[in-house]
């Protein structure tokens, strides 16, 4: 799947070096909760794409994963020159809803939330769980119901 964003202003989250390093050391559950909250705050999630802007899908045996992060700094770690031709890419909540959700459902892809170089499989959740968590927190924090729909 190719990510083609509309011309929109991406609300980026600025990450200090201290925050970056501290969060990378947290367990996958803490990183997951942090990521979900930041996706709601910024209405953006970050992933990696190849040189043709196709989503990079990780595999482990017969399982497929879409890696997602809360900010480009974390996604950028997976885009090492010479190691691969990946680049980080923002996905707005609108694009995620309109295009990516269907792609994930059609291809049986799980969500790999906030993997790190040390822990390439972060918290693995299915799409339904991911959407339910985001909707629950969005309603709790902002009174928004159905931030995403399946």
Spell out what each predicted region is.
Residues 2-150:
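Conserved NAD+-utilizing ADP-ribose enzyme module
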